[in-house]
Amino acid sequence: PELRGTYAALGCAPVVDYLRRLGVTTVELLPVHSFLNDRHLAEKGLQNYWGYNSLGYFAPETRYSASGKVKEFKTMVKTLHSAGIEVILDVVYNHTCEGNQLGPTLSMRGVDNASYYIVNADNRRYYDDFTGCGNTVNLEHPHALQLVMDSLRYWAEEMHVDGFRFDLASALARESGKVENLGGFFDAIGQDPTLNRVKLIAEPWDLGHGGYQVGNFPPGWAEWNDRYRDGLRGF
């Protein structure tokens, strides 16, 4: 019980054996990047246990670690791999926990707000929010793009994960606020010798105009399909 909800628990022998008996070949984890509790939840004494509120793109969330050490995550991945089970991460690069213009200044806002986020052209105090979370990371800017690419390579090369599911992936394609041929981020992925070999899964929409992009992602990408999902629900 003391390991419940931790990386060590997922990598312990009884859990791995159970997954193998089920015939599981891949596990996809909800976001494990270091994240922040939403203010409105904290004020009610609640916690964000989904993780879609990223703070640090290179740090495993410590509340999921029994030991508090990065090695625990790597050991979990190694143990699952030894059982023939791949590990895919759900990643949230479309926004951060800094929220809208009233949110806390914790990372990119304090470094270079107008470079790392898509700011409103008419009033740069405000953000163009294509994510519904207060801000949108600006992958059209080379520094923001490099940050995300470096993070992905770190998790693939150092932490040895097998792939990524990209939350609100259309937001990663926005250039000048529009989804234009899925943007330079996807070109960068395709040209990267590490990332073009891992599994890539898109949630192919965001909340902005033109964001619904099911069927339009590049070769090598898998996509969630909400219409197929809804069709299955009808049976």
Please tell me what each predicted stretch does.
Residues H160, A173-S176, N181-F235:
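Conserved alpha/beta catalytic core and glycan-binding cleft of carbohydrate-active enzymes
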